[in-house]
Curated annotation (Swiss-Prot):
Record's keyword terms, sorted: Chaperone, Cytoplasm, Ribosome biogenesis, rRNA processing
GO cellular component terms, A-Z: cytoplasm; ribosome
Protein species of origin: Nitratidesulfovibrio vulgaris (strain ATCC 29579 / DSM 644 / CCUG 34227 / NCIMB 8303 / VKM B-1760 / Hildenborough)
Molecular-function GO terms, alphabetical: ribosome binding
Function: An accessory protein needed during the final step in the assembly of 30S ribosomal subunit, possibly for assembly of the head region. Essential for efficient processing of 16S rRNA. May be needed both before and after RbfA during the maturation of 16S rRNA. It has affinity for free ribosomal 30S subunits but not for 70S ribosomes.
Domain notes per entry: The PRC barrel domain binds ribosomal protein uS19.
Gene: rimM
Pfam families: PRC_RimM, RimM
PRC barrel domain mapped to chain residues: 95-169
GO biological process: one example: rRNA processing
Annotated compartments: Cytoplasm
Lineage: Bacteria, Pseudomonadati, Thermodesulfobacteriota, Desulfovibrionia, Desulfovibrionales
SUPFAM superfamilies membership: PRC-barrel domain, Translation proteins
Listed name of the protein: Ribosome maturation factor RimM
Family: Belongs to the RimM family.
Length: 176
């Protein structure tokens, strides 16, 4: 049986309070992924399973207590750890939804011209937006705002995304 691939769902940023809570930069839409067992990974170490004892939201961000982490000192040791879940535990999505990790490596085509812009190298996210980091065939990096008016279609079967870039955006990155 093939081992499941791990998918990054968050980053442990800092302790919160004195009782072992850890602030999480959380990349998923559903907090249910923070129930039960998750995996933590530091650097090149293998992911290790940890049990989520409790989770609550504070100022729009999850605060998590892991089993065996009972104070601020223990929580501090988790700073910078990546939180993962096995890919095969992710819920099924609706037909018009995708997981961000599924976008990595797909071709990006400019709708107006049909021109191949490049390949999505990675996805950067913050509290406000999702940015596709696209690598062109010439090796240039394009930061593309993955907002509804600009992303027209994503076809995972053909591994392509059709975009309508805002006026002038590509000139910033592609002009010599």
């Amino acid at each position: 049986m093939e081992a499941s691939r791990f998918i990054e769902i968050g980053l442990l940023t800092r302790p919160h309070g004195l009782k072992g809570e850890v602030c999480v930069d959380y990349y998923a839409d559903s907090p249910f992924l923070l129930e039960g067992t998750v995996y933590l990974k530091a650097g090149r170490a293998a992911p290790r399973p940890v049990k989520v004892q409790s989770m609550r939201m504070h100022k729009g961000r999850p605060l998590v207590i892991f089993e065996g982490v009972n104070d601020r000192t223990a929580a501090e040791l988790l700073r910078g750890h990546v939180m993962l879940v096995p890919e095969d535990t992710l819920p099924e999505l609706d037909e018009d939804e995708v997981y961000l990790f599924e976008l990595e490596g797909i071709s990006v085509v400019i709708d107006e011209s049909g021109e191949h812009l490049g390949v999505i190298e990675r996805i950067d996210t913050d509290a406000y937006q999702e940015i596709w980091v696209i690598r062109t065939p010439q090796g240039k990096e394009v930061l593309f705002p993955a907002a509804a008016p600009f992303v027209l279609d994503i076809d995972l079967d053909s591994r392509t995304a059709r975009i309508a870039p805002p006026p002038g955006l590509l000139d910033i990155y592609l002009s010599d």
